[in-house]
């Protein structure tokens, strides 16, 4: 089919009215303002973390460091407990995400089969857990009875599957062509082979999106650590940084420690160190993220 572009004055040319151009300009302006509003807190955190305490105290709006200083990063990176906490968080994130994905993928694939007897009941039970939970105290008792107290596994196993992620992936699997599975089965492939050799490769956007959700949840989790982790050497990064912020505030109240430790630049350096790993990973998964979440949420 041959397509031709219509020049101005020719029949079929789309002429934008003045009202349409005004709307586009206002819309663009609002989007720019929204972007600035969203990015400024992060930019402020970054600028303060690279500023000296004197520079921070001299102004209330921080657009650029007037006096550069990396003492906050030097202090945090020189703390051996930071690296121990980093290692704990990396283990929790990697191991937790692998377990999450294995269980979620298998459960979503099975529940996507309409011919499965009782699949509606199973889906109802899964959705039921989104509205009603066991509560903090019963969950704590279960973790204690299982012998998981003061163990990194207490931050992994209780959250082995997320119902919201299960539903997204289940909807994605349900909309895939059944002919692919039937052809693979006729060629002698097993159900497990169909899942891991056929379905997963073509479900990369949805699977990558779910993996990113799980990884971010594990990386940012500190409530579970507060509940179940007692030893300081087993603290994840988030709990360690939280402790550093509280210790800085306590030092300020008591008048102890050096003036630097009481400053906001050290706190902002701690915050930046916590979000840098996720910032570095997100650009590599961004192209899958939007496609996966929209497709998985709409399909099925």
Model-derived features: positions:
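A hydrophobic, multi-pass inner-membrane permease signature
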Residues: 2-300
